[in-house]
Amino acid sequence: MGNWMPGWSSSGSLGVPPMPVQKLEKSVQVNLEPDEKCLSQTEVSSVPSQKLEEYIQANLKPDEESLKQIDQAVDAISDLLCSEVMIDVLKVVKGGSYGRKTVLRDCSDGTLVLFTGLFKQFQDQKKYQDKLLDLIEQRLKSHEKYKKSVKRKLSLLEVQVSIPGQSILLQLLPTFNPLCISENPSAQVYQNLKRSMDQVKASPGEFSDCFTTLQQRFFEKYPGRLKDLILLVKHWYKQLQDKWIIPSPPPLLYALELLTVYAWEQGCQTKDFDITQGIRTVLQLISQPTNLCVYWLDNYNFEDETVRNNLLHQLNSPRPVILDPTDPTNNVGKDDRFWQLLAEEAQEWLNSLRLNKPHKPCWDVLPMPFFITPSHCLDKFIKDFLQPDKVFLNQIKRAVDIICSFLKETCFQNSDIKVLKIIKGGSTAKGTALQQRSDADIIVFLSSLDSYDSLETERSQYVQEIRKQLEACQKAFNLGVKFDISKWMAPRVLSFTLESKSLKQSVEFDVLPAYDALGQLRSDYTSRLKAYKKLIELYASQDSLKGGEFSVCFTELQRDFIETRPTKLKGLIRLIKHWYKQCERKMKPKASLPPKYALELLTVYAWEHGSGTDGFDTAEGFRTVLDLVIRYRQLCVFWTVNYNFEEDHMRKFLLTQIQKKRPVILDPADPTGDVGGGDRWCWHLLAKEAKEWLSSSCFQVEPKSPVQPWKVPVVQTPGSCGAQIYPVVGGVY
């Protein structure tokens, strides 16, 4: 370190000192019409939602040429300090808003992190940073160009970098580089961080600047439009600072940036998103600070014991919790006093946005991760965050009634085709819908579809006809309809989004034409046998048919199989579906996961064989389903509620089905539908996620008392269902 280093005082910085709040200057008016100039002079919360994007471009985004000049000025400072032998700069990294490329027009913040070879460990930074700041200050003030722009306040050294129209208040930070040669942090890095913090009694997050390289990398992967949304949130926050008497803590600005990233990641992940939906979602999250718990596992995870213990300690801290994705000790969301003020302001802006048309709903984002929900709180989690309320369900019902009325009375009125019946399917009909998931399935049984063959060959033309009629009639019905583009040449389903004045938000629909295989006597076991016999004969004659090809014909049976179950079991199904959605989001590139219906059936199976009671423990049920997913290679699950082994043709077919490659999960409504699918889907990815979830707080009653799964066989045999048939394979637990 040099002979002069040991003589320095050991009293160091108490962490990143607070930056002074900068009063936001008036926005520059750019290309605004006379009647729009007021937009740049008013509170952002008063800007009409349809004008927000224009407002960002005209008032918040800095000029690119100005930023280039700022970069040149900052690079000049870097070069000057790198040339100073006594500072021993190994590497310079730009941080703060400047480094994250979330700079607001006019004035913004930034850091210049100087990784120095003089600091060999975290403790050195704590001991000697102030002395090194003295040296840097002297070097800059000795330069004619910088002596007037350098300011020193205790442990804070700043340089004002300004050009006409843009300025950056740059904080200079000599720092230890824990990454050294490696670009990615190992668990050892975070172990050293925790040990060093304990030794020198450092504050949480005090060494977060050491990870500025990771922070910069974390933000650079996100699209420019997301950074536009971040600018909007930051500008709103800056305007609020002018209203508050006490300056808010600087980490709060970073917390809002991270919260905006979280909202986009969890709810959208598309580059060309709607800014209004984005800001609604962020405001919705801000308005519930006592529920906020946000973190990432990009740079650290739960695998190492030291890191895991620290991470779980942080995640179980009082809300709000927003962890720095590069430093697990740094909760940038703490300080509930200001969050309450923010929550009130966010709700006020949210209410004003709701008055603007068209209404753009929030993305489906929860304020806290499911992973850290304690086992005893799972039922409350389901009720608060997953179970839809009556208003939502009535909304869906009204939308379904609109489409059903159109199909029955209008769509085929000028043809000989009759609508035999319309069945409401999907999660809404089964009673397992999730909050904010405004979708509905409608199955329309047509007289002209009188066989499985006719359904196979003609359904695409009826999809086109329904679309044609809906397009023609939407004005008469005062509807707004946006059709999804099908990737299939001959689509089996018509997917569209419905908007109406009678609906508070848009609703997504799937309409499927179907053959009425069960007829009006669907409760008659004989009619089901006939329908299944025809289906099996068709499969025997056509090798190209995939299993479940005609499952739409048995939607009523699928619906009734789930809908009649206890309310608490349907809550567990919601929990499993939410878990599945989280797994789905993590898959990059998108993987072909098993259908959600397979997980629903597995949940019912786990409950039937593990509990069977209305008052079961939700954590135990959840744990059991994950255990079955982990053991997917052994799974063989089926039911005999709608078909069984008694009839010869059915018995032979079922014995063939259950001898297929695992996993096998037969649709209880359609014996040809194996939603387990063997190798068809990526069960191994789902199993990997399930294993990682075993360390979740959901399964911890006490530190050394994990929740245990129910004892459920992974293999269902004909004998276990009461059939007098020698088991194909033995039951396995």
Swiss-Prot record:
Q: Localized where? A: Cytoplasm; Cytoplasm, Perinuclear region
Q: Which Pfam families match?
A: NTP_transf_2, OAS1_C
The chemistry this enzyme catalyses reads:
3 ATP = 5'-triphosphoadenylyl-(2'->5')-adenylyl-(2'->5')-adenosine + 2 diphosphate
Q: Which domain of life is it from?
A: Eukaryota
User: What GO molecular function annotations does the UniProt record carry, in alphabetical order?
Assistant: 2'-5'-oligoadenylate synthetase activity; ATP binding; double-stranded RNA binding; metal ion binding
Q: Does the keyword Transmembrane helix apply?
A: no
Post-translational modification summary for this protein: Myristoylation is not essential for its activity. Glycosylated. Glycosylation is essential for its activity.
- Sites binding Mg(2+) sit at 439, 441, 510
Q: Which family does it belong to?
A: Belongs to the 2-5A synthase family.
Q: Subunit notes for this chain?
A: Homodimer.
Report what the protein is called.
Answer: 2'-5'-oligoadenylate synthase 2
Origin organism is Rattus norvegicus
Taxonomic lineage: Eukaryota, Metazoa, Chordata, Craniata, Vertebrata
